[in-house]
């Protein structure tokens, strides 16, 4: 009996060993290496960088550009999930529950799901280049062209420091919302139609249907969406780097932590300082995910 238990344990361990080793080598090991490099002055060329302790972090917290990047990431952390989830829930509810009968959704809802999902099949760099043309400050811009034709002054969507951040946020929402429309639509499709029909018989309007039935039953999905979008807001890089002037400009008005990591590592060759930025970003991301899951925890509703 004891021998059989030992063989079973050995069998299970042999299967678990390979994925655990791969995880340690390719996931945990790079994190440990980044933490070590963050405490050195490595510039990418020396084999043995000098250990400088927490000097990179002291310098980091005194860097005004770093605090601008953190401010923009925190603004995205609040606004991107909030706007995206509100819009995605609205469109998903409209496609699945908001039809003439109040239950079946609007006509052609499958086609609209494909249209909403289309931005997800585009590479992020392609989206950034497309919106560079949309936001052009001259008459060839898709937005400024009609404004100038009507005699209005062109808007510096990417050249005005007061507008550029909101332009970046708009592009991020445009790219993300379609996926969550499809995600929430799948969740709504799993809710029995009988619930909506019974609520309508009891006199519930669409406002009550949404807040008393739809949202409570979709809460787990909304919670996961909020975490994913929050991580996206903290990790955003390509849209800012490709689309904006000076890769985070003008005047650092759109820069984010990921852009500063790339700039310091591959333009200034300050890999130690860039790694310190990465460590701070890592703790921001993990802290947000843990806090979100704990704050939004609630009793599961089954149906």
Where does each model-flagged region fall?
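A structural signal for multi-pass alpha-helical bundles of membrane permease subunits
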Residues: 11-303
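Short, Lys/Arg-rich, polar N-terminal cytosolic tail immediately upstream
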Residues: 1-6
